[in-house]
Each structure stands twice: as structure tokens, then as C-alpha cells.
Amino acid sequence: MKILFVCTGNTCRSPLAESIAKEVMPNHQFESRGIFAVNNQGVSNYVEDLVEEHHLAETTLSQQFTEADLKADIILTMSYSHKELIEAHFGLQNHVFTLHEYVKEAGEVIDPYGGTKEMYVHTYEELVSLILKLKDIIC
């Protein structure tokens, strides 16, 4: 099963979710993309720090979401606006959800970009919780 995480720039939330998911569910394929990503950019310094501190899977360089990405089995966005943009550009999709929506929770993963280390830690903790719930659903 291929699961794609999507955020805005593919430098904070979605690559962090990808790294966490790869550690938690090594038998599934995970990738990440950004709606407005500039290709081949590294993740933010705080994301790098968190990946190293928690011994997570190495992050990949940023990639912009394209029509080819619709081939993923499940596409999980960090916010409603990401989901809406995918549907506006590519039509209504029955396999695109917000991460919160997929695990039956309300809310969105707030973008820590430009914020403090504490904001990134909060995002990391939220993603761990959501991805553990995702594991319960798909495994």
C-alpha cells in the first residue's frame, strides 16, 4: 500500500509524517509532497533535528504534488485547504482525506514553518499520535 502525505512546501509537516510512518509501519510505502513545493529543497532545520533526535527514517528532498501522485492508494493532507486544492486541480477524489479526517478526528496539523522549536515539537507529537491511530486502521 502506498500512502502519500501532503502539506504546503514539503519541508515540515509532510516529510516529518513520512519519516514517522516509515518507522512505525515499515511494511508500507510512504512518500510526501507539497502543494506549492519547490523541488529538491531540504527539510527545515528543526525537522532535521527531530528526525535525528528520534532516530527516524531519513527525510527526502521536497517534491511538488503532481497528477502522477494521484496513483497513491491513500493521500493524506495536513489541512482541509490542501485537500480542497487537490480536488480543485484534479477533480473530486475518493482517496484524498485530511490526516485527522482519516483517523476520525477533527482538526488540522498546524504549520510550524518559521516557528519555534517548541512548535515543531508539538507538531511532531501530534503527528506521532495521528500516525499511531493510522497504524491501527491500516495494519
Curated annotation (Swiss-Prot):
One of its GO terms (molecular function) is protein tyrosine phosphatase activity. Its EC number is 3.1.3.48. SMART domains: LMWPc (SM00226). InterPro entries: LMW_PTPase, Ptyr_pPase, Ptyr_pPase_sf, Tyr_phospatase_low_mol_wt. Keywords: Hydrolase, Protein phosphatase. Inhibited by N-ethylmaleimide and sodium orthovanadate. Optimum pH is 5.7-6.5. It comes from the Bacteria. The active site is at residues 7, 13, 111. Optimum temperature is about 40 degrees Celsius. Disulfide bonds: none annotated. Dephosphorylates the phosphotyrosine-containing proteins. Belongs to the low molecular weight phosphotyrosine protein phosphatase family. This is Low molecular weight protein-tyrosine-phosphatase PtpB.
